């Protein structure tokens, strides 16, 4: 119950932001042409693929800052954040310029009607990295109320801007520009929260308790011998050697921290990028193979993939909780169970409606012209329910430092690509291929979580 109470406010904020986005999605479905809506769905899928690597930094931030807090090294956080922000800004600018130059080529490869919105989508994916950095700092500090507010800021600003820009005639480009601006506004809000809370000032906020003994991720703090007081004898050669050894240990620990952060971010980069592929490969491949089906399939895709977005919101609670408990030699199965329980509510509702009244729901939400993929609705809802569980399992495994999850996700993405591509753009066949892959992957990743937990219990 305690875990449920901790996750519920964040889940509520995420649900509010998601509900607002759903409302706008339904509205612009009626404002855009069928082909235009299909193109927007492809660009949104591209954004989520690009945002997953950016979110990898969030995982690395949470794990590394949690480890630094355990060994009373909050002094390292501010310098690292400043340096990382500088490098990230340079990369965002360069990537955005490259996106402008290549927007025509990318639009042609994706079989889009025009390059409109491509550069904005790519730039939004790059800026997401900055937002992920700041959200990671909020998560590592367990600042869940400001984090929940930040989700609402992003969601509501995206909604308002999308309606306004599409209404003035900017169409797909206006919708993608709204995504870019909402990410920028959310990052500004996160920066403001971090400044106000001052979470990582070592002179004001005490560090967390140290990790369990023998924790290789955080390292054990080394205490230097105190200098002699006035009148006391000068330390002998043995004491001087101890001082030198301490200095070398500190430098070694700092180097270990940098290497560990690089590995954490690299692992999360691969894992979350693969989750992005698994989430959107069906939309991209179907739209490329059969553009005439893209709009109708996008309608069911938008509805079902809200479950994945809900899982990502819940991961904002699960990730820091699992990382913190891992450093204490404990598991976070109660927190994982709480997030799965919350996720089960919208999943059950969507599965019920998509099975018994798919065409009616799509007709009310999107209009009669986007109901052609209704027979695939329930199947895709089941597939995305499985993927949502995989998202939670993956974040749990990343939080406890299990890097083999990348190979499982890579295998799943490869299987999904082959199976979906072989369906040649048929909505029902595409959804079935997706379900086969996602169900198998959820089972394997869930088993991995249980294996890791049993192993940690035996060790402890």
Where are the model-predicted features located?
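Hydrophobic alpha-helical transmembrane segments
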Residues: 115-122, 148-200, 428-453
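Signature of the first transmembrane helix
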Residues: 2-59, 96, 266-289
């Amino acid at each position: 119950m305690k875990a449920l109470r901790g996750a519920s406010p964040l889940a509520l904020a995420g649900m509010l932001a998601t509900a607002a986005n759903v409302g706008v999605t339904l509205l612009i479905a009626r404002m855009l042409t069928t082909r235009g809506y299909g193109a927007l769905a492809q660009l949104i899928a591209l954004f989520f693929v690009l945002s997953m690597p950016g979110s990898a930094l969030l995982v690395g931030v949470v794990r590394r800052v949690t480890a630094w807090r355990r060994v009373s090294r909050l002094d390292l956080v501010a310098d690292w954040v400043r340096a990382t922000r500088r490098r990230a800004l340079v990369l965002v600018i360069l990537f955005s310029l490259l996106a402008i130059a290549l927007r025509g080529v990318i639009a042609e490869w994706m079989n889009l009607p025009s390059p409109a919105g491509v550069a904005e989508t790519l730039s939004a994916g790059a800026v997401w990295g900055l937002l992920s950095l700041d959200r990671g700092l909020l998560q590592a500090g367990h600042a869940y109320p400001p984090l929940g507010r930040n989700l609402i800021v992003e969601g509501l600003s995206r909604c308002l801007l999308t309606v306004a820009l599409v209404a003035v005639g900017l169409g797909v480009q206006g919708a993608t520009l709204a995504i870019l601006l909402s990410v920028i506004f959310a990052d500004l809000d996160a920066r403001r929260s971090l400044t106000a809370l001052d979470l990582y000032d070592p002179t004001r906020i005490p560090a967390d308790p140290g990790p369990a003994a023998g924790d290789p991720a955080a390292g054990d703090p080394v205490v230097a011998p105190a200098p002699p007081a006035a009148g006391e004898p000068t330390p002998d050669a043995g004491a001087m050697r101890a001082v030198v050894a301490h200095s070398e240990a500190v430098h070694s620990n700092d180097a270990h921290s940098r290497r560990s952060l690089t590995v954490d971010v690299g692992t999360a980069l691969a894992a979350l990028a693969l989750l992005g592929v698994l989430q959107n490969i069906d939309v991209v491949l179907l739209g490329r193979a059969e553009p005439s089906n893209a709009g109708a399939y996008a309608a069911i895709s938008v509805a079902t993939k809200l479950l994945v977005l809900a899982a990502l919101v819940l991961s904002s609670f699960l990730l820091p909780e699992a990382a913190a408990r891992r450093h204490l030699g404990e598991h976070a199965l109660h927190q994982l169970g709480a997030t799965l329980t919350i996720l089960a509510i919208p999943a059950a509702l969507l599965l019920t409606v998509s099975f018994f009244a798919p065409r009616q729901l799509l007709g009310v939400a999107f209009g009669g012209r986007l109901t052609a993929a209704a027979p695939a609705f329930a199947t895709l809802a089941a597939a995305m329910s499985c993927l949502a569980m995989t998202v939670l399992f993956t974040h749990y495994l990343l939080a406890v430092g299990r890097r083999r999850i990348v190979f499982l996700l890579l295998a799943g993405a490869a299987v999904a690509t082959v199976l979906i591509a072989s369906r040649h753009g048929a909505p029902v066949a595409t959804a079935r291929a997706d379900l086969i892959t996602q169900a198998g992957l959820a089972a394997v990743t869930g088993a991995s979580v249980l294996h890791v937990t049993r192993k940690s219990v035996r060790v402890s």
